[in-house]
């Protein structure tokens, strides 16, 4: 099935506290001479109609990347759903006419070059309201497509229902799960630990650098 890809705003989620690396910003770690964040931006820029960064704290630390930084608008670091909500709110205000937001973890350096196209294709084929990425048998709910029209429902889920896990919220909707192969590498590998950074250096060669 071939569809026309609608305008899609990208958001890179970097709001986590990076406890497994002793604090700090995981996307600022370097792989093969480039930061992880540079790699993610380069991979998604051709696929999205603009990219913003969801991060908390001083936005100036990301100034070199030239992205608009949007903080959570729900307090106490409630997780990636808060970053997705912030992106939906920002898109509704600043990108009238754009109905879809792609979210991706800012510490996934090998994202697929067909991510946006295949997620849209999957949700269109299944007439779904949302779409998430899968590799092997592992779901990656942080990496998905979200309709701007669901933002008030998401806000209620976060603020009134205290829902924190993406899977718990998406269970309320028709969801398309779109799968990618894990060979020669898992495109949704993310750098959570110092050991993961070393593994990412090896995988970068398989990904073309």
From Swiss-Prot:
Keywords: Cytoplasm, GTP-binding, Magnesium, Metal-binding, Molybdenum cofactor biosynthesis, Nucleotide-binding, Transferase. It holds the Pfam family NTP_transf_3. The keyword Iron does not apply. The keyword Magnesium applies. CDD domains: MobA (cd02503). Mg(2+) binds at residue 107. GTP binds at residues 13-15, 26, 54, 72, 107. It catalyses: Mo-molybdopterin + GTP + H(+) = Mo-molybdopterin guanine dinucleotide + diphosphate. Its main location: cytoplasm. GO terms for molecular function: GTP binding; metal ion binding; molybdenum cofactor guanylyltransferase activity. GO terms for cellular component: cytoplasm. HAMAP family: MobA. Transfers a GMP moiety from GTP to Mo-molybdopterin (Mo-MPT) cofactor (Moco or molybdenum cofactor) to form Mo-molybdopterin guanine dinucleotide (Mo-MGD) cofactor. Monomer. Belongs to the MobA family. This is Molybdenum cofactor guanylyltransferase. The lineage of its organism: Bacteria, Pseudomonadati, Pseudomonadota, Alphaproteobacteria, Hyphomicrobiales. The gene is mobA.
